[in-house]
Amino acid sequence: MPTINQLVRKGREPQKAKSKVPAMEQNPQKRGVCTRVYTTTPKKPNSALRKVAKIRLTNSREVISYIPGEGHNLQEHSVVLIRGGRVRDLPGVRYHVLRGVLDTQGVKDRKQSRSKYGAKRPK
């Protein structure tokens, strides 16, 4: 523990906050290419086949990203835009794919919360 004198001379160093989405490098979105598209199962009490993609970003980092919504058209070599935001029941998944941008199509027949899934307004 420092003495009062040491604190007067040096002071306390403020703690740096660690980023929850380090691969984004302070950007709101990042572009990347799918290297693998697959399904995975969530942690205990939940049960499902969650759609995820391994993505090589423009800063040459590899991240696992969740594909939201029902059905998708992604495959290997698809170019996607990702945003931060983890999926609580999938360990290691800290990013989301943006729907309706670049090679990702919006969710078909989506009526509510359309902007989050890149769906156009139904006629």
UniProtKB/Swiss-Prot annotation:
PANTHER family from the UniProt entry: 30S RIBOSOMAL PROTEIN S12 FAMILY MEMBER
Q: Which Gene3D superfamilies match?
A: Nucleic acid-binding proteins (2.40.50.140)
The record's similarity note reads: Belongs to the universal ribosomal protein uS12 family.
Which residue intervals make up region (Disordered)? 1-29
For this UniProt record, the keywords arranged alphabetically read as follows: Methylation, Ribonucleoprotein, Ribosomal protein, RNA-binding, rRNA-binding, tRNA-binding
Which residues does this entry mark as bearing 3-methylthioaspartic acid? 89
The UniProt entry's GO CC annotations, sorted and at most eight, read:
small ribosomal subunit
Organism (species): Novosphingobium aromaticivorans (strain ATCC 700278 / DSM 12444 / CCUG 56034 / CIP 105152 / NBRC 16084 / F199)
Which GO molecular-function terms appear in the entry? rRNA binding; structural constituent of ribosome; tRNA binding
Protein name (database record): Small ribosomal subunit protein uS12
Extract one GO BP annotation from the record: translation
Summary of subunit composition and partner proteins: Part of the 30S ribosomal subunit. Contacts proteins S8 and S17. May interact with IF1 in the 30S initiation complex.
- What exactly does this protein do? With S4 and S5 plays an important role in translational accuracy. Interacts with and stabilizes bases of the 16S rRNA that are involved in tRNA selection in the A site and with the mRNA backbone. Located at the interface of the 30S and 50S subunits, it traverses the body of the 30S subunit contacting proteins on the other side and probably holding the rRNA structure together. The combined cluster of proteins S8, S12 and S17 appears to hold together the shoulder and platform of the 30S subunit.
